[in-house]
Regions:
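Short linear loop/turn motifs
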Residues: 32, 85-87
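Glycine-rich, small/polar surface segments that engage phosphate groups of diverse ligands
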Residues: 53-83
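Active-site and ligand/interface coordination hotspots across diverse enzymes
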Residues: 1-64, 203, 208-260
């Protein structure tokens, strides 16, 4: 899918979100907030739901939590324009309460379709309700800063999910803010791990001799629309959050990537 095709598909979904009446939240919203960002990105950030400022402007993460997210991205040399940002629910829950299970379920098809279009390498969850969509049963106090393969049923067919605290929690608790900077510093390395994992999956046997193409050959194949994400060149050091991800071309078993 080309960049233009992705953008067009995302705009169709956004139009459906703005007209949505699938749950009670449409009765109290000012604007629905479909999400925004680079349609060719490799990294998608998924928050919990819009707040007051987002409801007013129709854009995700534009309040104080959004300002912190921009600073977190800047700490690794990224801009919010480099990624795609959305939420598990697209309308503001009244009084900024937690989204209810049926509200999350009502929005699930929109998020799944967005991820199918974007086909990200990494999904970064922000907060426990977002994390619960991709890491059922995990506790954010244990899971933040770690990753695991995404269930293809979520729409991200071949991605890794990386858990973080919500920026709003970081604003309330200095210790969580410090941990959030530590966590986001690992996201570029998670991106490399996902790229290597995808390259290994894409190797195909040659019919004549049964030879399998190496990762290097896959990695250097022309990309009609390179995605502008920066990631460290070096392989992860021993002891890092993804120390079980080897630098070799072999496919990493998914159980080795489940780190908690």
């Amino acid at each position: 899918m080309t960049r233009a095709e992705r953008q067009a598909a995302l705009e169709v979904i956004a139009g459906e979100v703005r007209a949505c009446t699938r749950c009670r939240l449409h009765t109290t919203r000012t604007q629905a907030v479909p999400g925004e960002g680079d349609p060719s990105t490799e990294v998608v950030f998924v928050g919990e739901g819009p707040g007051m400022n987002e409801d007013r402007l129709g854009r995700p993460f534009v309040g104080r939590a959004g300002d912190l997210l921009v600073r977190l991205l800047g700490s690794i040399g990224w801009r919010r324009e480099d990624v795609f940002i959305t939420n598990v629910v697209k309308c503001r829950p009244p009084d900024n309460r937690d989204p209810e299970a049926d509200e999350i379920a009502a929005c699930e098809p929109y998020l799944r379709r967005q991820l199918e279009v974007l086909d990200p390498a990494v999904v970064v969850t922000l907060g426990r309700h977002s994390m619960g969509r991709f890491m059922p049963g995990a506790r954010i106090s244990h899971a933040h800063g770690t990753m695991r393969p995404v269930d293809p049923a979520t729409g991200a067919a071949d991605a890794l999910v990386f858990a973080m605290y919500h920026p709003a929690a970081a604003l309330r608790t200095p210790a969580i803010e410090r941990e959030s900077y530590d966590d986001i510093a690992r996201v570029p390395t998670a991106l490399i791990a996902s790229r290597e994992r995808r390259a290994a999956r894409e190797r195909t046997p040659v019919a004549a001799g049964g030879v399998t193409a190496g990762t290097a050959a896959v990695a250097t194949a022309p990309d009609p629309e390179p995605k502008p994400m920066r990631a460290p060149e070096a392989s992860p050091e021993p002891g890092s959050v993804i120390e079980s991800q080897p630098a070799s071309a072999d496919l990493v078993p998914t159980d080795q990537l489940t780190l908690f």
